[in-house]
A protein has these predicted regions:
Chain A
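Conserved ABC transporter NBD signature motif
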Residues: 57-68, 72-73
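Catalytic Walker B motif of ABC-type/P-loop ATPase nucleotide-binding domains
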Residues: 155-159
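Conserved ABC ATPase "signature" region
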Residues: 97, 101, 108-126
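Conserved ABC ATPase signature
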Residues: 89, 130-137
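ABC transporter nucleotide-binding domain
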Residues: 173-266
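Conserved catalytic motifs of ABC-family nucleotide-binding domains
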Residues: 151
Length: 310, 372
């Protein structure tokens, strides 16, 4: 086990930020910590990194207790925090070199690592730029390069794509997968379910400092009763027909907005086929039709009764 | 690791334009302003030769020989212009002479205003008249006694200078300015604490996650700040001495030592405020500027009289104000022949440095935070 946190409790006065949270990260996986803002993701990361005090629990990294002075453990950990933490007075190259130098004293080795990190995040053309000249997306990439240049075995990324343009976001996500392929174990926190779904091999959903579900994305989706969501473009449907549609077996809700009818179903085989048969039997004229599997947001919604992004 | 952190801190701080402005450009600009504003201060108390119009209506060789003595030598008292009475009146009216001495059987003095030069002329003539009258009386009674008399003035006081230096009032302003510049080094101290306390900045949080003892990192980084401040102070001193021609006496080695101590106290003061005061960086910056300016004001940077008022009305404040201790250390070094006052000031500064640095250490040594 690369990372193990047991029974973590962290209180800020009356507020319980972490409520007996336990998690395990295995070697070589991309572990996603998914939860809405304020759910305790960053607090959990700060506890794991021994940055903040916690009231209860214990943390082991690489099988050994984590502590502020556990320097032999820290040298194999790379951290990319939510907020960009670089020096505005240093260029891209100098920033990466400075932070890498805190881990790698040898100048020659470091030079190579810095070059690799800059190439990896796609900032080769910007190495002499100062951070103020970089766009938000490029700045995030620089933040990542500063955290990973020393080639750590465990990389913790805390919402690294907040306020990033889609192009940079994709680049960052691809980079994380590439780092994982190179052998790094990743802990990735986000409130963007699409990102977590896309790159994480195992996911923990947390809310109010508690773990509410854990497993692969398929495991998580199996936990809920909700089946697929079917959307049909119709050209004229009556209230009566909508009511009939809702009364079909395994259909939970039907909503209509303009020409689009959204049908949510419970888990069952052939839901789409049954809906199509109904439309045909009622002679309802229709255009596009598509079906989607439940998302992690649906999982979160069913378990907590609220949207992930609330 | 020392070289890595030290070198990068130098780079970061030297490229920080705001920091360089407040710690180097601002004191130099203020020194230039002081030099323009107080340039004539030192001259107001100096003595100039008194211009006198001499109107000789009757010959008086005895008096003329005395006058010749007063106009000769390296530091003459009078500059005489022998003129006619109407010309003397014109010179007096135009302000070219301080007074008209008319030489006849008895001497007379005419002035058209009161002042130090006119008073000196009056005292001179009074004393001459008094001495000649006394000598005349004695000569009439016993000429032999007069022959044996010593007319050298008897002085009942002895002059013992407290200083080897010449008095220059404007120096006090420059001392307070140098003290202020040292204490503007507190910005460096604040930056260093911000860079090491994970609950104060994101960069500090990142540094705290590195496999590095945070107090070592703090020390290496602070040394870079201290080095820059010392170089800035040396540049300020060079500007004062070489460009503005301010004379700081011949104890330059001790002056530099005092700057080292003052800069140390200044940086530790910044660290103290940054670690003790809760609030954002702007609040702390405001507090540092306010405290330094208040300390400089009480040390006499804006009005020299304030320093004396503090000495008279609240002497304890002299010792509680580190800016004053530093300014006064320079003052003591320049004006006094003994080092007691200087040592008291330096000891006070070191006590402050220890208290500030010690308190900062107690906060900075914390390894985990309640929140970041």
């Amino acid at each position: 086990m690369i990372l193990e946190a047991n029974n973590l409790v962290k209180r800020y006065g009356d507020l319980v930020a972490l409520d007996h949270l336990s998690l395990e990260v295995k070697k070589g996986e991309i572990f996603g910590l998914l939860g809405p803002n304020g759910s305790g993701k960053t607090t959990a990361i700060n506890c794991i990194l021994s940055l903040i005090k916690y009231d209860k629990g214990d943390i082991h990294v690489f099988g050994r207790p984590m502590a502020p002075d556990a320097y032999d453990l820290k040298k194999d950990i790379g951290v990319v925090m939510q907020d960009v933490a670089v020096f505005n007075e240093l260029t891209v190259y100098e920033n990466v070199d400075y932070f890498c130098g805190l881990y790698v004293p040898d100048k020659q080795t470091r030079k190579q690592l810095v070059e690799e990190a800059i190439d990896f995040v796609g900032l080769s053309d910007y190495r002499k730029f100062y951070p103020k000249k970089l766009s938000g997306g490029l700045l995030r990439r620089l933040n990542i390069a500063c955290g990973i240049a020393h080639k750590p075995k465990l990389i913790i990324l805390d919402e690294p794509t907040v306020a990033v343009d889609p192009q940079s976001r994709n680049r960052i996500l691809e980079g994380i997968v590439a780092l994982n392929r190179q052998g790094a174990t990743i802990v990735y926190t986000s409130h963007y379910m699409e990102e977590v779904e896309k790159i994480c091999s195992r996911i923990m959903i947390i809310d109010k400092g508690r773990s509410i579900a854990e497993g692969t994305k398929d495991d998580l989706k199996k936990m809920i009763s909700l089946g697929e969501k079917i959307t049909v473009e119709v050209f004229g449907i009556s209230e009566e027909q909508l009511e009939k549609l809702e009364n079909l077996p395994h259909i939970s809700t039907v909503t209509c907005e303009g020409n689009l009818v959204e049908i949510r179903s419970h888990k069952s085989k052939n839901n789409l086929e049954k809906v199509l048969e109904f439309i045909k039997s009622e002679n309802i004229s229709f255009g596009r039709i598509y079906s989607e599997l439940p998302t992690l947001n649906d999982v979160f919604l069913e378990i907590t009764g609220k949207e992930l992004r609330d | 690791m020392f070289r890595h952190i030290f070198a990068y801190r130098l780079k970061v701080l030297l490229r920080d334009k705001t920091m360089i402005f407040w710690t180097m450009i601002f004191p130099i600009a203020l020194a230039t302003f002081f030099n323009l504003a107080f340039g004539g201060l030192g001259e107001s108390g100096s003595f100039n030769v008194i211009d006198v119009a001499l109107v000789e209506t009757q010959p008086n060789p005895q008096f003329m020989s005395v006058l010749d003595m007063m106009t000769a030598g390296e530091t003459p008292l009078f500059a005489l212009q022998k003129v006619t009475a109407p010309r003397g009146e014109t010179l007096l009216a135009d302000g070219h002479v301080a007074g008209i001495i008319t030489v006849s059987e008895s001497m007379s003095l005419k002035v058209n205003q009161s002042g130090i030069r006119q008073s000196i002329l009056k005292v001179f003539l009074d004393r001459y008249a008094h001495t000649t009258r006394t000598a005349g009386r004695i000569a009439a009674e016993d000429p032999q006694v007069l022959m044996e008399m010593d007319f050298t003035p008897v002085v009942f006081t002895e002059e013992r200078p407290v200083s080897h230096a010449e008095m220059d009032i404007k120096l006090s302003y420059f001392y307070a300015l140098i003290a202020m510049a040292c204490f503007y080094g507190s910005f460096f101290g604040m930056e260093e604490v911000n860079l090491i306390q994970a609950n104060l900045s994101k960069r500090a949080a990142r540094l705290n996650m590195a496999p590095l003892h945070k107090l070592k990192a703090f020390l290496y980084s602070s040394l870079a700040s201290y080095s820059i401040l010392i170089v800035e102070m040396m540049l300020l001193m060079a500007y004062l001495v070489l460009i503005l021609k301010i004379d700081f006496g011949n104890q330059i080695g001790w002056v530099i030592f005092t700057i080292f101590v003052g800069s140390l106290t200044g940086i530790s003061f910044g660290g103290f405020i940054a670690s003790m005061v809760k609030g954002d960086e702007n609040v702390k910056t405001g507090l540092l500027i306010g405290a330094t300016m208040a300390g400089s004001f009480l040390a006499g940077m804006m009005f020299q009289n304030v320093k004396h008022l503090v000495q008279l009305k609240a002497p304890i404040l002299q010792y509680l104000n580190p800016v004053n201790l530093l300014a006064d250390a320079f003052y003591a070094l320049y004006f006094f022949n003994t080092c007691k006052r200087y040592l008291i000031n330096i000891a006070g500064l070191l006590v402050f440095a220890v208290v500030f640095a010690g308190s900062t250490y107690l906060v900075v040594r914390r390894r985990k935070y309640a929140s970041v």
